[in-house]
Curated annotation (Swiss-Prot):
It catalyses: a ribonucleoside 5'-phosphate + H2O = a ribonucleoside + phosphate. It is found in: Cytoplasm. Coiled coil: none annotated. It comes from Shewanella sp. (strain W3-18-1). This is 5'-nucleotidase SurE.
Length: 249
């Protein structure tokens, strides 16, 4: 049976990772390794100045006092009994679309899996109430099975966003590009109980590019979006432009 490594950024006790693990154990041997706390927004950060401590839980999951990227790196390099066939991250409580992907620990966990040489998928549930993790879990299993039967090029990560709808209300799957958001809203300034000044980052901006073909548009219209992402951040179309600029300075 195939081996799948599951991780997330919401933490080892989050309902999304439980739904994902339970869906995938029907088709694979699953190892679940996730942060011991919520690490939303951790992006691709690694812990380099402190040791990583683990805790083996009664349900078989392993919690790590580290980031999502730490979890995947540690699991593949040390904790897994043999290499996984795939890394699946999620199910995130909240969408990871457009610019969100730059900050997302969910996407970063998948990216670390891909960076280490394995097919990788990130899956997130759009919405505010998060009632339908099972819908996302069904699509996660379907897409993972599809990857096993029909492998894709190994240089991509599949970023999946699922509308928070009952399964029978989801219209299907659309292949999308990343949309874009407006700038995040302002900083919230307040004081702690001792009267010291503290700051909270404001909520993300509203959609700026949610046109047809984007992940925002697909999910808003009841479809699951799948966006291929790459680890290589090179802006290839700008190479010749940059070379011309360098030649002038």
């Amino acid at each position: 049976m195939i081996r799948i490594l599951v991780s997330n950024d919401d933490g080892v006790n989050a309902p999304g990772i439980k739904a994902l693990t339970e869906a995938l154990v029907e088709i694979a041997n699953v190892m679940t390794v996730a942060p011991d706390r919520n690490c939303s927004g951790a992006s691709n950060s690694l812990t380099l100045t402190n040791p990583l401590r683990i805790n083996r839980l009664d349900n078989g999951y392993i919690s790590v006092h580290g980031t999502p990227t730490d979890c995947v790196h540690l699991a593949i390099r040390e904790l897994c009994d043999g290499e996984p066939d795939m890394v699946v991250s999620g199910i995130n409580a909240g969408a990871n679309m457009g610019d969100d992907t730059l900050y997302s620990g969910t996407v970063a966990a998948a990216m670390e899996g891909r960076f280490l040489g394995f097919p990788a998928v990130a899956i997130s549930l759009n919405g505010r109430e998060f009632k339908h993790y099972q819908s996302a879990a069904v699509y996660a299993r379907r897409i993972v099975q599809g990857l096993l039967l029909h492998p894709l090029a190994s240089d991509q990560i599949l970023n999946i966003n699922v509308p928070d709808l009952p399964l029978d209300e989801i219209k299907g799957i659309r292949v999308t590009r990343l949309g874009a958001r407006h700038k995040a809203e302002g900083i919230v300034r307040t004081k702690d109980p001792a009267g010291r000044e503290i700051f909270w980052l404001g909520p993300p901006g509203l959609e700026q590019d949610a046109t047809e073909g984007t992940d925002f548009h697909a999910v808003a219209n009841g479809y699951v979006s799948i966006t291929p992402l790459t680890v290589d951040l090179t802006a290839y179309r700008q190479l010749s432009v940059l070379q011309n600029w360098v030649d002038k300075i």
